[in-house]
Swiss-Prot record:
Gene3D superfamilies: Nucleoside diphosphate kinase-like domain. This is Nucleoside diphosphate kinase. Major role in the synthesis of nucleoside triphosphates other than ATP. The ATP gamma phosphate is transferred to the NDP beta phosphate via a ping-pong mechanism, using a phosphorylated active-site intermediate. HAMAP family: NDP_kinase (MF_00451). The keyword Thylakoid does not apply. Keywords: ATP-binding, Cytoplasm, Kinase, Magnesium, Metal-binding, Nucleotide metabolism, Nucleotide-binding, Phosphoprotein, Transferase. It comes from Pelotomaculum thermopropionicum (strain DSM 13744 / JCM 10971 / SI). Its main location: cytoplasm. Its cofactor is Mg(2+). CDD domains: NDPk_I. ATP binds at residues 9, 57, 85, 91, 102, 112. Its EC number is 2.7.4.6. It is found in: Cytoplasm. GO terms for molecular function: ATP binding; metal ion binding; nucleoside diphosphate kinase activity.
Amino acid sequence: MERTYLMIKPDGVQRGLVGEIIARFEKRGFKIVGLKMIRIGRELAEKHYGEHKGKPFFEPLVGYITSSPVVAMVIEGKNAVGAAREMMGATDPLKAAPGTIRGTYGIDIGRNVIHGSDSPASAQREIALFFSADELMEYGLELDRWVYE
C-alpha cells in the first residue's frame, strides 16, 4: 500500500471543514495512519516549502501557513498519492473540477484548503518532516478485503 501526506491548511481549519475533508478520504477507502493538529513554526514551514525559497510568493506562503493551526495527516491505500491529488483537484480552485475538495471549498490559489504530496518521493519526505515513526499506526481494517482483494 502507498502512503501520502495531506495537510488541511489554515483556511480549512478556520472555516470548519476538517471533518468533511477527512470523511471524503475515509469514504474513498483510505486508511488514516497519522493525524494531528499542529501549529507550524517558521523553521518547519521553510523546510516544507524550501523548493519555493527565493520566489516572490515564498514569504506570504510561509506567513500564511504559520498563521493558524493546520491538520497534518497520512493516509494509506492503493495509489494514495495520485488518488488524493485527483480528489483535491487543481491547485487553483477556479480550475478545479466541480466536486473536488478545492473545486467545492477553495477560494483562490492561496486559500485552497488542502495540500497533498505531488509524488511518492515527496510523500516520503513530507511524512518524515511532519511525523515521527512512532506517530504512524499499522493496523488492519475489515474493509481492506472488500477494497483491495
